[in-house]
Amino acid sequence: MKEAGMSMNAPARHKRGGLYFEGFEVGKLHEHTLTRTVTQMDNMLFSNMTLNPQPLHIDREFCAKETEWGQPLMNSLFTLGLMIGISVTDLTVGTTIANLGMVDTKFPHPLFENDTVHCTTEIIGKRESKSRPNAGIVELHHRAYNQDNKLVAECRRQAFILKQPKA
């Protein structure tokens, strides 16, 4: 997250670093500094772990001869997981109770081997939990870009987040 040093008014954080519900500011855009260059080994491992034999992800010869891309595409669910994972250190490590769902998930441009992913998260909503007084629901809009700033993935996600413990 690109923020100048911590101020006296910085929101309280969990000992592991995540923001409590009260620290999420609707409208704030977090630009995550953590990046990741993806590899074909990432693609192979993920595809094998998820039992996905799609040649579009794992077969260079097939992709070179039979696709418009000419090379394997990174598995879109790997891309989705990476995008959300990159946000965790800055925002939710130690404070997420559960993911409640994702909507409007899109992959407008393919991600390829050796692309470097960087991400942003915009806080687009939050509300108190009706059933749990120690938590709230935060809505996040995650976006992932490649090294050329082409949008490769986005989704809106609702997360169940802990409130700051009472002293």
Residue map of PLM features:
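HotDog/MaoC-like acyl-thioester-processing domains
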Residues: K2-V26, F107-T116, T120-A167
